[in-house]
Amino acid sequence: MKHKRTLATEIPPEVKAIVWERDDRKCIFCRRYVPMFFANAHYIKRSQGGLGIPENIFTACDRCHREEDAGKNSLKYRDIAKKHLQEKCPNWDEEKLYYKKGMELDERF
């Protein structure tokens, strides 16, 4: 059985579908079309307790996702992702993107 934090930070299929449509089925960085599988990038990383909710997830192709995660321009990519999420999610609040101990899974949305 998975731990609550693991469940809270993974991205459910319905969230991937919402994010992929919201992001026009394209990588938010290079604007190339990508399959729905690529709606899988966390703004607040899973390792930091980033929730698998639309406000924390964006669509990125493999190349851009790697660059955003650990490339020499990762801060630039993160800034673009933050602005994108703020624009697409009117009530975006970075503090609400983290898993908090005792949080129920249905509190994510």
Please describe what each predicted stretch is:
Residues 1, 34-36, 81:
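Generic preference for hydrophobic/aromatic residues in regular secondary structure cores
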Residues 31, 45-46:
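Intrinsically disordered, low-complexity segments enriched in polar/charged residues with Gly/Pro
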Residues 5, 25-26, 43:
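Generic detector of short, locally flexible boundary/turn motifs and exposed helical patches
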Residues 10-39, 61-63:
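Short cysteine-rich loop/turn motifs with clustered Cys
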Residues 3-7, 47-58, 66-109:
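Polybasic, low-complexity binding patches
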Residues 36-43, 70-74:
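Short Cys/His-rich "knuckle" micro-motifs
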